[in-house]
Regions:
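N-terminal [4Fe-4S]-dependent radical SAM core
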Residues: 1-23, 30-50, 67-70
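Short, small-residue-rich loop/turn micro-motifs
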Residues: 26, 38, 130-134
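Conserved non-cysteine loop/helix-boundary elements of the Radical SAM core domain that shape
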Residues: 39-59, 80-86, 137-145
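Conserved AdoMet/S-adenosylmethionine-binding subsite of the radical SAM
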Residues: 62-74, 83-145
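Short N-terminal amphipathic alpha-helix/helix-capping patch enriched in small hydrophobics
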Residues: 20-23, 27, 57-61
Length: 145
């Protein structure tokens, strides 16, 4: 997985829980109001000096999260759009095997993967961002629905 950001402690991202937040790189929308615009490109962007944003190692993040089980109640996977990540299912499985609650923030554009994760009992909370009325998606999100 392309993990482009990590927050050790959040009291606001998972209602009623203390969580860590993992931010994935890449989104299939281009919402003009996005507060994580640097995560929209499928690859990390370069800063003014030409440096690429580093990705976090997924296994290292899982290891760190396992050590924080007594501090956090769960993990939020956000982005970008997490369901674009090829390694999402195995990442979530590792978190569940570690006894952590998992919240997924998604734009809902990958319903097949979302259904698989829900049906497998791998998600404890799903926050689906409905961005606009269906007839306004192209204008607001840069994508027809």
């Amino acid at each position: 997985m392309k993990i482009a950001g990590f927050v050790k402690n959040s009291f606001v991202d998972y209602p009623g829980k203390i969580s860590s937040v993992v931010f994935t790189q890449g989104c299939n929308m281009n919402c003009w109001y996005c507060h994580n615009r640097h995560l929209i490109p499928l690859e990390a962007t370069h800063d003014e000096d030409g440096n690429t944003s580093p990705y976090y190692d997924s296994e290292a993040i899982i290891g760190l999260l396992k050590t924080r089980r007594k501090i956090i109640d769960g993990v939020v996977i956000s982005g970008g759009e997490p369901t674009l990540q090829p390694g999402l299912e195995s990442f979530v499985k590792s978190l569940k095997e570690a006894g952590l609650n998992v919240k997924l923030d998604t734009n809902g554009t990958n319903p097949g993967l979302l259904s698989r994760l829900i049906d497998a009992g791998m998600l404890d909370y799903v926050a689906m961002d409905i961005k606009a009325p269906i007839d306004k998606y192209a204008e607001i999100c840069g994508k027809h629905m």
